[in-house]
Structure formats: structure tokens, C-alpha cells
């Protein structure tokens, strides 16, 4: 199985750039405190880097 990362949304998407809101949706995050487990790929890492100030990453 591939390596995975746990991503948790820690801040609200209200008032953020539409591009950043779309990135959160692309990661599968819906609300503050919501956690998803994703494959650790360059694509996912790029999305995390774009919204680093709204998420916490483990693993």
C-alpha cells in the first residue's frame, strides 16, 4: 500500500480565495475538524502547500 497522509482542516474557508476553497474541496475537506486520509503523491502535496495555513498534516 502507498504511503498516506492525514489532513485536517483547522481554519474556516469563509472569505478565502475561490481557488483555495476549490483546493479544500479537492482534498475532500468540508468543515473545520474534518480529517481525510490521502495518498502521499506530489499532486496532493502541492494542494496541501497551497492551503497550508488552513490545514494540519500528519504522517
Swiss-Prot record:
Keyword Ribonucleoprotein belongs to the record: yes
Keywords assigned: Ribonucleoprotein, Ribosomal protein
Entry GO MF terms: structural constituent of ribosome
A Pfam entry, by short name: Ribosomal_L30
InterPro entries, per database record: Ribo_uL30_ferredoxin-like_sf, Ribosomal_uL30_bac-type, Ribosomal_uL30_CS, Ribosomal_uL30_ferredoxin-like
Top-level taxon in the UniProt lineage: Bacteria
GO biological process: translation
A GO cellular-component term linked to this record: cytosolic large ribosomal subunit
Keyword match Kinase: no
Classification via PANTHER family: LARGE RIBOSOMAL SUBUNIT PROTEIN UL30M (PTHR15892:SF2), MITOCHONDRIAL RIBOSOMAL PROTEIN L30 (PTHR15892)
Family of the protein in this entry: Belongs to the universal ribosomal protein uL30 family.
NCBIfam families the UniProt entry points to: rpmD_bact (TIGR01308)
SUBUNIT field: Part of the 50S ribosomal subunit.
Protein known as: Large ribosomal subunit protein uL30
Gene giving rise to this polypeptide: rpmD
Amino acid at each position: 500500500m502507498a504511503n498516506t497522509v492525514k489532513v485536517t482542516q483547522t481554519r474556516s474557508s469563509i472569505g478565502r480565495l475561490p481557488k483555495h476553497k476549490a483546493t479544500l474541496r479537492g482534498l475532500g475537506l468540508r468543515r473545520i475538524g474534518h480529517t481525510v486520509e490521502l495518498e502521499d503523491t506530489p499532486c496532493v502535496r502541492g494542494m496541501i502547500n497551497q492551503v497550508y495555513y488552513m490545514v494540519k498534516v500528519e504522517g
